[in-house]
């Protein structure tokens, strides 16, 4: 059998750091108010780089660190809800910039669950035997869709990108078990870049494209539905919650992670966290955490670590993959 394996991980964030104190100068907020409610201290905000620029820097790191000829890359998937444009896709822009001339490339839109959904897809592409090597990236520049006058959302988000290189060299399944979910009926609780009908033949007025969020509804969704998804995936894997080495969850809010750890009966320090430095980077949050963990020696990519990856957010979407890293 053919098994996919993650062989490289990389991340990139803009140099410009915006602290809670910086935000207090442009809106009615302060460090204590933000940190006590979210666990966020800083976020990196782009001053000129677009989503494809961030993603390209990640892809170049993955290729350079692996020594792989970019022409041997079979596919590139970029998970994002803040693309440079709808056409061409962010992934197509990355493909051109890194010289992956033989790769097919496309964007996947699943908000904060995007990286987990994309990794699941990539694993199937490789384990099918049809493709040997691919790149999966989560990349966001949320600063371009935020309403900077709305303190309820502006304090939460940051910009960044991260990803992994996969190939067919695995000696065991990459994904032990998974469960992906969507509930479009609740999709209106988190909206961004809404594109209304605008033609000479329609009388519909244009509505703004800034991000809007029903904070309480999203918080309740995260603490009620997501732990059930993780538990169901654990049951499919025949693993107990404490048998997992680390939990890498979407970095939305430290209080959400506190509640999830308690509901699952898992030691809180198994839930890795870096939102204090990056804020909520949507599809980029899980791979940034993964890449940082490898860089900092928390775990390596030797196939010996069992990790839960869980994303949750707009769509509504949520999903878990238990993987051998």
From Swiss-Prot:
EC numbers on record: 2.3.1.180
Pathway(s) served: Lipid metabolism; fatty acid biosynthesis
Catalytic activity: malonyl-[ACP] + acetyl-CoA + H(+) = 3-oxobutanoyl-[ACP] + CO2 + CoA
Ranges for region ACP-binding: 251-255
Keyword Transit peptide annotated: no
CC annotations in GO: cytoplasm
Localization per record: Cytoplasm
CDD domains (alphabetical): KAS_III
GO MF annotations in UniProt: 3-oxoacyl-[acyl-carrier-protein] synthase activity; beta-ketoacyl-acyl-carrier-protein synthase III activity
Similarity comment text for this entry: Belongs to the thiolase-like superfamily. FabH family.
PANTHER family named in the record: 3-OXOACYL-[ACYL-CARRIER-PROTEIN] SYNTHASE, BETA-KETOACYL-[ACYL-CARRIER-PROTEIN] SYNTHASE III, CHLOROPLASTIC
Subunit structure: Homodimer.
Protein name: Beta-ketoacyl-[acyl-carrier-protein] synthase III
Organism in which the protein naturally occurs: Lactococcus lactis subsp. cremoris (strain SK11)
Lineage: Bacteria, Bacillati, Bacillota, Bacilli, Lactobacillales
